[in-house]
Amino acid sequence: MARLDVYRNPDGNGFLLDVQADLMSHLKSRLVIPLVRSDIAPLPIKVLNPVFELEDALYMLLTQQMAAVSIRMLKSPVHNVNDRRDEVVAAIDLLLQGI
């Protein structure tokens, strides 16, 4: 498991983005943010909800729904968004720090 790996959401609704530091990989949980199809997602908030193209569809990062899940929920990664790291960090910073 690596930071910014994307996993299929086991509930069948989009994906989960792993945002936990690799240094904490020994823990039995991972901090994730849901990625939900843009056409069913709430109205986006600039910076907080960047949009990603995955498998020919647009998915919104619902940073405000960040949560910890058991590593058992995360199977094999299907994507990695390391190239969008700065946007993900900015979204988390906005949620946690207000900046």
Q: What are these model-predicted stretches?
A:
Residues A2, D18, L74-V78:
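Residues at structural and domain junctions
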Residues M1-R3, I99:
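Absolute protein N-terminus
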Residues P50-E53:
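Short conserved beta-strand and strand-loop elements enriched in small hydrophobics
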Residues R3-V6, P10, F15-L48:
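Compact nucleic-acid interaction/catalytic patches
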Residues E55-I99:
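C-terminal terminal-subdomain/extension
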